[in-house]
From Swiss-Prot:
Residues 659-726 form the S1 motif domain. Its cofactor is Mg(2+). Belongs to the polyribonucleotide nucleotidyltransferase family. Keywords: Cytoplasm, Magnesium, Metal-binding, Nucleotidyltransferase, RNA-binding, Transferase. GO terms for molecular function: 3'-5'-RNA exonuclease activity; magnesium ion binding; polyribonucleotide nucleotidyltransferase activity; RNA binding. GO terms for biological process: mRNA catabolic process; RNA processing. This is Polyribonucleotide nucleotidyltransferase. It comes from the Bacteria.
Length: 732
């Protein structure tokens, strides 16, 4: 049945069309907003798979034709998803995954395709809304609508779903997703801004010492206080609830009859459970409290093996795999009971305790800056490299008018050996891109990248037992400091967890892998002394209460300040690798001296570049000469050499008389003539028209580099000497 619904809520006008296209799917919708058109489809396999996780795949695909473009490169088809597409697919996946019923083991694919794009549309908000609508009206047993919401803060005013042009003025980028009952997902980033200050200076330190004023810009992180952030999230939650109520009220008219699916929630053998509880509970609790992750896992396997070999197990015919599942399930029960009833965690910590932290900086002698950050059994080696403007990552958004450039990059790598897996390292996947993006958003507000520079951070996770993305944030901030880069403030991150049973709950600080696996929430918070710069929350319960969210934010703040204190102590001990750092110096000369630095046909500047291994950028109008190189002493030497050149009195040009006959050597050829090296080391131009009495197509048809020729001086103006080929002039 065809249905069309229009909504205008929260600065967003949407039109949903059901039953019009893609009718062979389990559910589909065409969503229109402004000039944006999206197709969302849901397809489910009929046969179940034997997995212990929800077999859900989400794709978000942007078509180039949606913005009137043809894909660049040699292959004129859309290729693998870009970073924005991958991150958007993750957002949709994380918001919708909690809605599926337990025991749902049917492979399901949700696809969102952008068919037309409006430059002012927030494609991530619309993608989630479209996917949720398609799932809601499908015959899959999910009857909850999810709404995405973008929240900005411009000039102190909170805005919901602002146009993208307005979002660029915001100091807050907050993305919320939830149902009419609770929030399911949060992504937040503070957006740094610049303030201007007027400072005293001189007109030109070399040429004009007159006092003047200069306007400078200072980076402000705009970290948000926990109380304000919690308040804005609460406002957003109310907005989402209203939207979801409206969606469900109308979408139900287009919803298909739900399939009666067989669900296979994970069950355990009650007899084995009872036996394990009576005989082996103490052994499992002892294994849970083993300090090392690998030791804990081995002990649990040994217990399962021990049970499988005893007489009762043999009599009952219990298999090892079945026993191990029960042991794992009982382990989860013990972990949660210890936390809720004893306030004690598997590794002996209290609920608010942070694992021991060890920090080493600049351990890589050839790198610009490095930090080995270890927290418990999680270890990140973060390395900073300083590049030039040309090293920036070029990318193009679907609706952008041209290429854009990323001058601050964070790349996160998670090799299998970090968790003891014997697998080869492969290309980064969605998880790596997501963690790198979170770390970048956490650090970006405090990093001020000069216009002519590019900073790249690479995080190599060497050990992982929870919170590796937050270790990347901590290590990244110190790696930047180790590369002698000024930060507006240090940034630290911590992962929070949640255990909920009936009316009891406990919030955990700095969760390890066990608590992430057996807990109900993964809540990552990063920030400075002043507030939060980035946050990411995923909930497994189907929602989180506002009270718990506020408490988790405050508890995260306490942990962050503790970590920042340790990081500050480490930062004070950093020994900068001065000899490794690229150096850049700008000197000011009189604009008339620029020609001396360049030299005839670029001879002098080329010699400087080759001799000192530097690059040189010149602003002719202002007389600014910027010298950049990988070796600081060579950069300084090049600057000294340039100043020597510009301070030397300009030599008088070698003077020739019109009609002088000279012998010279062809030094260089161009399409308009040849340059001849004359006595005294000066060059003269032998124009192509003077090479023959007739027409010459190519200079090389008459003379080549290295040829000795006899020429006649036709004219001289200063250093510019015009020559004629003697043998041609004699014939004339």
């Amino acid at each position: 049945m065809k249905c069309r619904f229009e909504f205008e809520m929260n600065n967003l006008k949407e039109i949903y069309e059901f039953g019009e296209v893609a009718k062979q799917t389990n559910g589909s919708v065409l969503l229109k907003s402004g000039k944006t058109v999206m197709l969302a489809t849901v397809v489910m396999e009929k046969e179940m798979v034997d997995e212990d996780f929800l077999p859900l795949t989400v794709q978000y695909i942007e078509k180039s034709y949606a913005a009137g473009k043809i894909p660049g490169g040699f292959v004129k088809r859309e290729q693998k998803p870009g970073d924005f597409e991958t991150l958007t697919a993750r957002i949709v996946d994380r918001a919708l995954r909690p809605l599926f019923p337990k025991g749902y083991l049917y492979p399901t694919v949700i696809t969102v395709m952008v068919l037309s794009a409006d430059p002012e549309s927030d494609l991530q908000v619309l993608a989630l809304n479209a996917a949720s609508a398609a799932l809601f009206v499908s015959d899959i047993p999910v009857r909850k609508a999810v709404s995405g919401l973008r929240v900005a803060k411009v000039d102190g005013e909170v805005l919901f779903n602002p146009p993208l042009s307005k979002l660029k003025e915001s100091t807050l980028d907050l993305y919320l997703a939830g149902t009419k009952e609770e929030l399911l997902m949060i992504e937040m980033a503070a957006i740094g801004s610049y303030k201007t200050e007027v400072v005293p200076t001189t007109v030109d330190p070399l040429m004009d010492p007159t006092l003047a004023e200069e306007v400078i810009t200072i980076k402000e992180p705009n970290a948000m206080k926990e109380e304000e952030l919690a308040s804005i999230i609460a406002q957003g939650k109310d907005v989402i609830q209203i939207a979801c109520n409206e969606y469900e009220k109308y979408f139900i008219e287009s919803a298909k009859e739900q399939l009666e699916l067989e669900l296979l929630p994970q069950t355990i053998d009650e007899d084995i459970w009872t036996y394990v509880e009576e005989i082996y509970a103490a052994d499992i609790k002892e294994a849970v409290q083993a300090m090392a992750k690998s030791e804990r896992n081995e002990l649990l396997k040994e217990i399962a093996k021990k049970i499988s070999e005893d007489d009762v197990a043999k009599e009952q015919g219990w298999e090892y795999e079945t026993i191990y599942k029960v042991v794992e399930k009982y382990k989860r029960k013990i972990v949660r009971e210890m936390i809720l009833n004893e306030g004690k965690r598997a590794d002996g910590r209290g609920l608010k305790d942070v694992r021991p932290i060890d920090i080493k900086t600049n351990i890589l002698p050839s790198a610009h800056g490095s930090c080995l950050f270890t927290r418990g059994e999680t270890q990140a080696l973060v390395v900073c490299t300083i590049g030039e403007k040309t090293d920036a990552q070029m990318y193009e958004m679907l609706t952008s008018k041209g290429p854009e450039y990323e001058h601050f990059m964070v790349h996160y790598n998670f090799p299998p050996f970090s968790v003891g897996e014997a697998k080869p390292i492969s290309a980064p996947g969605r998880r790596e891109l997501g963690h790198g993006n979170l770390a970048r958003r956490a650090l970006e507000p405090v990093v001020d990248v000069p216009e002519d520079k590019t900073y790249r951070l690479v995080s190599e996770i060497l050990e992982s037992n929870g919170s590796s993305s937050m270790a990347t944030v901590c290590g990244g901030a110190l790696a930047l400091k180790a590369a002698n880069i000024d930060l507006a403030d240090l940034v630290a991150g911590v992962a929070m967890g949640l255990i909920v049973e009936d009316d009891k709950y406990a919030i955990l600080t700095d969760i390890m892998g066990l608590e992430d696996h057996d807990g109900d929430m993964d809540f990552k918070v990063a920030g400075t002394h002043d507030g939060v710069t980035a946050m990411q929350m995923d909930i497994k319960l189907g929602g989180v209460q506002q009270e718990i969210l506020e408490q988790a934010l405050q508890q995260a703040r306490e942990a962050r300040l503790h970590i920042l204190k340790i990081m500050e102590e480490a930062a004070e001990k950093i020994e900068i690798n001065e000899e490794n750092l690229p150096s850049s110096h700008t000197i000011t000369v009189h604009p008339s001296k620029i020609v001396d630095i360049i030299g005839q046909a670029g001879k002098t500047i080329k010699e400087i570049i080759e001799k000192f291994e530097v690059s040189i950028d010149i602003d002719r109008d202002k007389g600014k000469v910027k010298v950049t190189g990988k070796n600081r002493p060579k950069v300084i030497a090049a600057c000294d050499y340039i100043q020597e050149i510009t301070n030397k009195p300009k030599p008088e040009p070698v003077k020739f008389q019109e009609g002088d006959i000279l012998k010279g050597k062809i030094k260089r050829t161009t399409n308009f003539g040849a340059f001849v090296e004359l006595p005294g080391g000066v060059d003269g131009l032998l124009h192509i028209s003077k090479l023959s009495s007739g027409r010459v197509e190519r200079v090389e048809d008459v003379v080549n580099i290295g040829d000795e020729v006899e020429v006649e001086v036709l004219s001289q103006k200063g250093h510019k000497i015009e020559l004629g080929l003697r043998q041609v002039l004699k014939k004339a």
